[in-house]
Amino acid sequence: MVENNIILEMNGISKNFPGVKALDGVDLKVKKGTVHALMGENGAGKSTLMKCLFGIYRSDDGEIVLGGKKVQFKNAKDALENGISMIHQELHPVPHRSVMENVWLGRFPVKKVFGLGIVDHKKMYEDTKDLLGKLKMNIDPNTLVSKLSVSQVQGLEIAKAVSYNSKIIVMDEPTSSLTENEVTHLFNIISDLKNQGVAIIYISHKMEEILKIADEVTIMRDGKYIGTWEAEGLTTDLIISKMVGRDLTNRFPPKENTPGEVIMKVENLTSANNKSFKDISFELRKGEILGIGGLVGAQRTELVESIFGLRKIETGKIYINGQEVKIKSPINSKKYGIALLTEERRSTGIFPVLTVGDNTIIAGLDKYIDLKFVVNQKRGMKDIKNSIEKLNIRTPSHATQIKNLSGGNQQKVIFSRWLLTEPDVLIMDEPTRGIDVGAKYEIYSIISDLSKMGKSIIMISSEMPELIGMSDRIMIMCDGRLSGIIEGEEATQEEIMKYATRFI
């Protein structure tokens, strides 16, 4: 009999790489029909532990027990066939195939016709329809995957896992690209899976989600097992202190900036793109952190991309230091001292195969090109080294490919890139998305220091504690319209939500 309904035990798992002890005697016990959150900063060993479970890595020590039997999977396929599935943060379905073909890829049902085995499309359709129905997903099995939303693709991956009769499903940052309604739907699916006895290993940095969905929480730090707790008795501060290894006194730096005169003024801005936002007016002061809040779909990103020159404006005016400016492209924006850190760091922020050094200076290459149109390596290297030192970028070398850095260090490189262009206004779209709690504080400190230096910050964030903790004022959008502006020190989550839903 399986003790305490435990379906999976990982006991004393250790894994060494040359010069690095990635896992040091880690334990994980997961119960049937529960959501078990696995938490830790980037580099804590969560991914390595899951790779040991899936047979991608072979552990150097320890044992894995599944359903009371000791196992050692040869590869991910072996794990899948034994009832363990994983839904990755980066979803990779086959876009130009149907939903049902993606679900049953590599194991299409076959029927005999004149002695020949051919794909039984009718059975595949019916099986997929039944599967999606059980998950309360209203999708035609014949729909091309390329036509699905992100949440529907995620649902497809869950359906695929269920089709393997998975006893355990690992979900890695499953809500990172979902709207609030889509998150609610995902949680409903997870609840149904729990009722069917499926165990969910849930990896996320989002504290409020963990406290809402998880039954138990296991925390790792520096490749070590810190402990497992029932989620019901935990708080956000307690989780963070266990993750970072110190008591949490302040999640955000103290506000020591003093906003000065108006540096940017936006008047009656309306988008040329089907009026996705309309009649937006606001002011930004020197040294101010202006937060922008709102639900997904409020058109916050569209607004800041239009200010930066990435999108066309139909009507309205932008003033910099009292002078009206026409910003038609990011090159114009840079000339007027405006920088933009985009929301999607991996796809539009970094150049993944370029080095840390190249990513640092790429926005200001004109500074390093001499009269012979040759890059002045000495001048470039000086700025690269200064940036790495000032922003405490943790990298083996400036020649390391940026894709090998953690999310927090990648974000610091993007900060350094734009700081070298000497901007007066920095627009940041979700600057801490996908970054662990320890690195978040470092990013907050950089933003705070920049505001104290007189830099003006526009910061979009979907995390209300972040908006309240960092902003001098919070501008809230709803359905493409400005619904209110609140002083940061007076803001509450309830008031932000009231304005965020004002026009819905």
UniProtKB/Swiss-Prot annotation:
InterPro entries to which the protein is assigned, alphabetical: AAA+_ATPase, ABC_carbohydrate_import_ATPase, ABC_transporter-like_ATP-bd, ABC_transporter-like_CS, P-loop_NTPase
Superkingdom of origin organism: Bacteria
Keyword Cell membrane listed: yes
Membrane disposition: Peripheral membrane protein
Record CDD domains: ABC_Carb_Monos_I, ABC_Carb_Monos_II
EC number assigned by the record: 7.5.2.11
GO cellular component: plasma membrane
Cysteine disulfide partners in this protein: none
Reaction it catalyzes: D-galactose(out) + ATP + H2O = D-galactose(in) + ADP + phosphate + H(+); methyl beta-D-galactoside(out) + ATP + H2O = methyl beta-D-galactoside(in) + ADP + phosphate + H(+)
SUPFAM superfamilies, per database record: P-loop containing nucleoside triphosphate hydrolases
Keywords, comma-separated and alphabetical: ATP-binding, Cell membrane, Membrane, Nucleotide-binding, Repeat, Sugar transport, Translocase, Transport
Residues the record lists as binding ATP: 40-47
Cell compartments where the protein resides: Cell membrane
GO molecular function, one term: ATP binding
Domain ABC transporter, residue spans: 8-247, 258-504
Subunit and interaction comment: The complex is composed of one ATP-binding protein (MglA), two transmembrane proteins (MglC) and a solute-binding protein (MglB).
General function of this protein: Part of the ABC transporter complex MglABC involved in galactose/methyl galactoside import. Responsible for energy coupling to the transport system.
Family designation: Belongs to the ABC transporter superfamily. Galactose/methyl galactoside importer (TC 3.A.1.2.3) family.
Designated name of the protein: Galactose/methyl galactoside import ATP-binding protein MglA
